[in-house]
Amino acid sequence: MLPVPSTDFEHMFELAPVSLWLEDYSAVRRLFEQWRAAGVVDVVPHLRRHPECVRAYGASIRLLRVNRRTLELFAAPDQATLEASLDQVFRGDMFESAIAEIAQLWDGVPEYANQTVNYALDGRRLDVRIRGRILPGYEGCWSRVLVSLEDVTERVQARLRLERSEKYARGLFEHSPVSLWVEDFSAV
């Protein structure tokens, strides 16, 4: 098998059809060590009692690099703009999903998966499926974590529309002031 030139890997990262983030979680690892030294055993209830710890987790992640698809998805002209606007990207309805992500890492799992909400810089809500992986060789320090984001907004919105439609039809059927019944004439 021929060795793959490093430029090929650069192109694969940059041109991947999914959003890719290369991040440094070494400060997260140190934060976890502090929490453990303070006596935290079960991280989920601890985080619910201390939401500032979730914010500390987020602030501990250092962004190293993103690819083009990330910039397109988040409507950012460049990485510096995206990085300066992360408080707009990660906000509000992320609390519970962040706890799930933290719990997976806390348990020593080198990979995590999660579904959450982010926001593009133009204000659009993005439902995203996140997968993170501590890269091989960095398990001891967590200084290289590859995170992918899949935009599942259309799927989530379609499911919500279907649920609303079903609820409307069920309500119409159950609360109609006249008799309604359904017949199947497909066999006729």
Language-model features: locations:
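Terminal output helix/cap of sensory domains in signal transduction proteins
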Residues: A80-L82, L86-V117
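PAS/PAC or PAS-like capping segment
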Residues: S26, L135, V152-T153
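Short loop/turn elements at sensory-signaling interfaces that couple input to output
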Residues: L121-R125, R129-V145
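PAS/LOV and related PAS-like sensory modules
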Residues: L2-E52, A56, L160-V188
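PAS-family sensory domains
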Residues: W21, L64, E96, E101, Y112, N114-L126, R129-R133, ...
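PAS/PAS-like sensory domain cap-loop motif
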Residues: T70-T81
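Sensory coupling linkers of modular signal transduction proteins
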Residues: E139-G140, V145-R170
